[in-house]
Amino acid sequence: LMEPKILESVVTALLHTDFPETTHQGILDEVNLSGHVLPKQAVRDPHFRKSVMLAYEFRCAFCGYDGRINSRPVGIEAAHVKMHSKGGPDDVSNGIALCSLHHLLFDSGVLSLSDEVEILVSQYFLESDYDTPSSAMKLIGQLMRHPQPGYDLPAAEFLRWHRGNLFTEPARKRD
């Protein structure tokens, strides 16, 4: 195969250039490299997370999840709409607060948003049980929760980038 250090460098560069961080571990597992290459976390502006979380009041903009342990938010993350590695800024206009599940589905191309911030679900996404509380199918056609007054919705240019580069089209139609 390849020299381990070279392999790690190549894989790390590819992951950080072409894939959202939330998908790195799954990709490494899929190609049997999870024991050989450790995904490195990119350095981010800590103000981005704080600003996005405050804008969305520490709750998922898709489902409203707002779990806490000892008053500390858990399972809620600041997601970039346009990947940071593709020139997406660390700005609230490029961010959405999402629960861990919806962040992964958003970064994996399962979920996206229309210009009117209607939640889109890929036709290619399958679930075995649509009746579970966390079913992505329940989100089809719903409007995302807006940030609190004083904060803008995600910018249309970043939403279009997400749909054109990450979302697996076409979107499902509402029943």
Where are these regions (language model features)?
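Charged, low-complexity surface segments at secondary-structure and domain boundaries
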Residues: 1, 33-39, 142-147
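Short, charged surface segments at domain edges that flank catalytic/cofactor-binding sites
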Residues: 10-66, 82-93, 171
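A detector for short metal-coordination/catalytic motifs
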Residues: 43, 68, 72, 76-175
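Mixed-charge, low-complexity interaction segments
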Residues: 1-33, 116-122, 128-131, 136
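Alpha-helical structural motif
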Residues: 6-7, 20-23, 48, 151, ...
